[in-house]
């Protein structure tokens, strides 16, 4: 996504090496990313931010996708003409996820989607993740709150010092006393 410099290695998606691809190539292949850092356009309205997520789409399709994303986050519907700068941190995170969904991704990467959010907004984000999973979207959650991400995952990967130190069934990771005590506290 152009956020970090690509130095080597391989990233494979659906049997294809996507290492070093540009953001537009990733989006065109159904991959969307929501970073941990605030990445909305503060001087644009909520609606304009959503439109930026699909500015190459035909207007009717774009409007349908915006409508679907506003249904997922009703708080945004009530603020669609407000500037993004006026939104709370939780609302900005909902907007960032909504904008990523405009591209109709098949694979969604969420980096710390609930970090520094109030419990109310955390719950709304979690509900949206569950809804997206139920729609068949593959979601990779990078999250320090392992219990939050593992509770809604099929598989879990525990990384320590930059290396995968455990992988397996998410429920097994959550319930195995040795793994849980060591990694989940």
PLM regions and their residue ranges:
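Glycine-rich phosphate-binding loops of nucleotide-dependent enzymes
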Residues: 1-185
